[in-house]
Amino acid sequence: MSMQDPIADMLTRIRNGQAANKVGVTMPSSKLKVAIAEVLKEEGFINSFTVEGDITNPTLVIILKYYQGKPVVERIDRISCPSLRIYKKRDALPKVMGGMGIAIISTSKGVITDRAARQAGLGGEVICYVA
């Protein structure tokens, strides 16, 4: 049986891994998942990530981050789903928790945060919120 929403699966694995105090989580890899992991690493929500395995079956390994024994990611929510895509113009990009969190946006220039999209004057698909 095929997976309906691989990005929601990725976010759920991160959420469940941190709830269970796991060191890391593994999942099937894709270009979009690697781009999301890169944004999470740049923003300090995960320690690191690697892509392992061969070209035909790559696996994404994400090393989770904790601060004083508590998960750094308090909330991670999928916004745009395959059945209901959510697009925002540059003027309507959301602020997560009053600027304390980030929204990950897929734009024509790649996957970036809401802050970077505002600075570049780009809109796009709102993939998820992370706080």
Swiss-Prot record:
SUPFAM superfamilies: Ribosomal protein S8. Keywords: Ribonucleoprotein, Ribosomal protein, RNA-binding, rRNA-binding. PROSITE patterns: RIBOSOMAL_S8 (PS00053). GO terms for molecular function: rRNA binding; structural constituent of ribosome. Disulfide bonds: none annotated. InterPro entries: Ribosomal_uS8 (IPR000630), Ribosomal_uS8_CS (IPR047863), Ribosomal_uS8_sf (IPR035987). One of its GO terms (cellular component) is ribosome. Belongs to the universal ribosomal protein uS8 family. HAMAP family: Ribosomal_uS8_B (MF_01302_B). This is Small ribosomal subunit protein uS8. It comes from Hamiltonella defensa subsp. Acyrthosiphon pisum (strain 5AT). The gene is rpsH.
